[in-house]
């Protein structure tokens, strides 16, 4: 409750999620063993706890759910859970949705259509075709990007993808991505250029312990900030697209400059300004105007 109260105060929109599995298990001893017995009670507790919070805009009945694509029984479960949610959120304070890795399967698409609000995990490639097929279904990115980066680490050149490195760190030059993800700038454009898309939830805001990616490390590298909540460079990309130049002008330049003498380095500037001029030792290196087409 404390987390959602903070979101209420500062204006963060919450996709409030319940189940990580339904009847089909992900591990030997997970909640699938009790799902059918406890689902109604779990939904009641979940919805009644959070239904009066203005920050909650979505009730997600699951994420990465195996049942949704293997057969039509998943549709029946999804409809059951939707009805449970509506039983306790009878004023429809928030919509009912699901986050899906399996949206390319017909059964999963039908569930999204039935719910009316469908979350897509890393499947922006389906947006246009599915919007044409299901024009009345709201589409949004329930998980996007999954670019990995270490704060203050740069592996050159920027145009060479490299997920791992000898130092076991990830590059902050937008050239470290996992197989299922994409750079933050690309994921942003996928959403920005589609008026029918309701937005996206970026994976992730903050690094977290577990899911070591790349393996083997102690934690993930997905965050805009590290585990101490210190901003990485990509934090300033999101600041540049979420703020107004006329109200809060900003620019963030990377990387730092004390590399080996004579080593070519890639320079990146994140800004909400229409143009940026780069100076080295007082000498102009030219002006770059913002490229809206490519972010």
Region annotations inferred by a language model:
Residues 1-117, 121-138, 143-157:
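Active-site mouth of glycoside hydrolases
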Residues 55-59, 78-94, 99, 110-112, ...:
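Substrate-binding clefts and catalytic carboxylate motifs of secreted carbohydrate-active enzymes
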């Amino acid at each position: 409750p404390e987390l959602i109260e903070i979101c209420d105060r500062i204006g963060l929109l919450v996709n409030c999620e319940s189940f990580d599995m339904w009847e089909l298990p992900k591990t030997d001893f997970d909640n699938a063993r009790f799902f059918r017995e406890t689902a109604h009670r779990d939904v009641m507790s979940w919805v009644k706890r959070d239904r009066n919070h203005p920050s909650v805009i979505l009730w997600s009945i699951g994420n990465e759910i195996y049942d949704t694509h293997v057969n039509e029984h998943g549709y029946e479960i999804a409809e059951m859970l939707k009805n449970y949610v509506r039983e306790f959120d009878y004023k429809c304070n928030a919509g009912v949705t699901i986050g899906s890795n399996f949206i390319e399967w017909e059964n999963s698409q039908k569930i999204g259509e039935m719910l009316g609000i469908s979350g897509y995990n890393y499947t922006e490639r389906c947006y246009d075709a599915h919007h044409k097929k299901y024009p009345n279904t709201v589409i949004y990115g329930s998980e996007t990007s999954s670019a990995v980066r270490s704060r203050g680490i740069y592996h050159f050149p920027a145009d060479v993808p490299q997920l791992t490195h000898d130092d076991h760190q990830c590059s902050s030059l937008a050239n470290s991505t996992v197989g299922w993800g994409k750079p933050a700038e690309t994921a942003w454009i996928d959403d920005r250029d589609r008026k029918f898309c309701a937005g996206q939830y970026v994976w992730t805001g903050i690094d977290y312990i577990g899911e070591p990616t790349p393996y083997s490390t102690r934690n993930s590298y997905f965050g805009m900030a590290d585990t101490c909540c210190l901003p990485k460079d990509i934090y300033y990309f999101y600041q540049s697209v979420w703020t107004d130049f006329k109200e809060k002008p900003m620019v963030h330049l990377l990387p730092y400059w004390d590399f080996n003498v004579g080593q070519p380095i890639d320079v990146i500037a994140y800004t909400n300004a229409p143009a940026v001029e780069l100076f080295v030792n007082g000498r102009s290196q030219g002006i770059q105007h913002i490229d809206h087409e490519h972010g």
